[in-house]
């Protein structure tokens, strides 16, 4: 289990202040626990029970064990690579820890009324805690750790209805699978770009993400209203777009991390988005037309706007002038997101022969 606070080893490890919340940083979520507890799983109970049995096996119980490869690995990185890698560790640890908190609270709050659902969430909380702890331990190699207890108490929590939790976490888990497996496969072919031994663990790690995504797939199928009808189609499109756009803008903004791994951030993200979009067709009624060139052109405009907004924040201009500079960028972002949302989606049935 993740410790509630970061523990300094012989006073050598400092507690790192969490990054300032922005639209691109990981969110912490809460939901309507009574609604979750009252869910009738019978429409897809057999599949959920089968997935829970997979969780019980805990395939990665002995996987996240550090070895001698970590000794001195941090000292081999140049200052810029250290900076972008620590940023990656921090963002990843925060994301995994937010999942742990949500899943743990769900398992605790619905245990009496919905034991099968509660057990599934407890197993996923176990996995997320393991991931977050492993990432935070890697941060200690660089002389710092996150105070996870402070994050628990002081982070703002976003309330989502259960169905929105399903959409967001399903996409987060599936996109996490494709991100991790893509990096792992690239580094297997290009070992000279493996800047830190944590990447050796990504192959098994990504299978946890995949199983979690499969759980939410089965859970949505047990609640047919989440994936059927015109309103469900609109929400599926919205969450696909929000997740893809956020990832693309964030990753291009920190492209130096991917360059350190020998990857191009745009090429990497395009592959991850295409694969996730294809995978999502297994459960969502519609997916995005990511093969339309306009999709990528509009994402690039979001990247440009985000860069301009960050530049305005860094400037020493007076607050009114900063606002004047940022306002047209905000308006442009809204317009581009609207154009992206209004692009014709693809019926998931057209993807089925290709979905594996």
Swiss-Prot record:
What reaction does this enzyme carry out catalytically? Mg-protoporphyrin IX 13-monomethyl ester + 3 NADPH + 3 O2 + 2 H(+) = 3,8-divinyl protochlorophyllide a + 3 NADP(+) + 5 H2O
Q: Which residues cross the membrane?
A: none
Q: Which Pfam families match?
A: Rubrerythrin
Q: Does the keyword Transmembrane apply?
A: no
- Top-level division of the source organism's lineage: Bacteria
Q: What class of enzyme is it?
A: oxidoreductase
GO MF terms listed in the record are: iron ion binding; magnesium-protoporphyrin IX monomethyl ester (oxidative) cyclase activity
Q: Which InterPro entries match?
A: AcsF, Ferritin-like_SF, Rr_diiron-bd_dom
Q: What is its EC number?
A: 1.14.13.81
Keywords tagged on the record = Chlorophyll biosynthesis, Iron, Metal-binding, NADP, Oxidoreductase, Photosynthesis
Which BP terms does GO give this entry? light-independent chlorophyll biosynthetic process; photosynthesis
Pathway membership: Porphyrin-containing compound metabolism; chlorophyll biosynthesis (light-independent)
Obligatory cofactor(s): Fe cation
The UniProt similarity line reads:
Belongs to the AcsF family.
What does it do? Catalyzes the formation of the isocyclic ring in chlorophyll biosynthesis. Mediates the cyclase reaction, which results in the formation of divinylprotochlorophyllide (Pchlide) characteristic of all chlorophylls from magnesium-protoporphyrin IX 13-monomethyl ester (MgPMME).
Q: Which HAMAP family match?
A: AcsF
- What name has this protein been given in UniProt? Magnesium-protoporphyrin IX monomethyl ester [oxidative] cyclase
């Amino acid at each position: 289990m993740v410790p509630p606070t970061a523990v300094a080893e012989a006073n050598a490890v400092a507690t790192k202040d969490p990054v300032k919340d922005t639209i691109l940083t990981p969110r912490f979520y809460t939901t309507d626990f009574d609604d979750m507890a009252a869910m009738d799983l019978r429409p897809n109970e057999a599949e959920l029970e089968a997935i829970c049995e997979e969780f019980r096996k805990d395939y990665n119980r002995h996987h996240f064990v550090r070895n001698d490869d970590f000794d001195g690995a941090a000292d081999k990185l140049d200052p810029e690579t250290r900076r972008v890698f620590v940023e990656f560790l921090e963002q990843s640890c925060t994301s995994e820890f937010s999942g742990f908190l949500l899943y743990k609270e769900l398992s605790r709050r619905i245990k009496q009324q919905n034991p099968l659902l509660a057990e599934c969430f407890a197993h996923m909380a176990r996995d997320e805690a393991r991931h977050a702890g492993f990432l935070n331990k890697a941060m200690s190699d660089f002389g710092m750790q996150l105070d996870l207890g402070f994050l628990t108490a002081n982070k703002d929590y976003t309330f989502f209805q259960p169905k929105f939790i399903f959409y967001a976490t399903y996409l987060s888990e599936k996109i996490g699978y494709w991100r991790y497996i893509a990096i792992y496969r690239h580094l297997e072919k290009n070992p000279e770009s493996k800047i830190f031994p944590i990447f050796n663990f990504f192959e098994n790690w990504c299978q946890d993400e995949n199983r979690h995504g499969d759980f939410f797939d089965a859970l949505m199928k047990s609640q047919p209203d989440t994936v059927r009808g015109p309103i469900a189609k609109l929400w599926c499109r919205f969450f696909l777009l929000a997740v893809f756009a956020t990832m693309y803008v964030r990753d291009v903004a920190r492209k130096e991390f991917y360059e350190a791994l020998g990857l191009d951030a745009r090429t990497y993200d395009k592959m991850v988005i295409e694969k996730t979009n294809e995978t999502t067709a297994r459960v969502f009624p519609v997916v995005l037309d990511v093969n339309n060139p306009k999709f990528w052109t509009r994402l690039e405009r979001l990247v440009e706007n985000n860069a301009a907004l960050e530049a305005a924040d860094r400037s020493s201009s007076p607050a009114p002038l900063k606002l004047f500079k940022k306002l047209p960028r905000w308006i442009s972002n809204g317009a581009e997101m609207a154009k992206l949302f209004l692009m014709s989606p693809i019926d998931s049935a057209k993807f089925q022969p290709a979905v594996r």
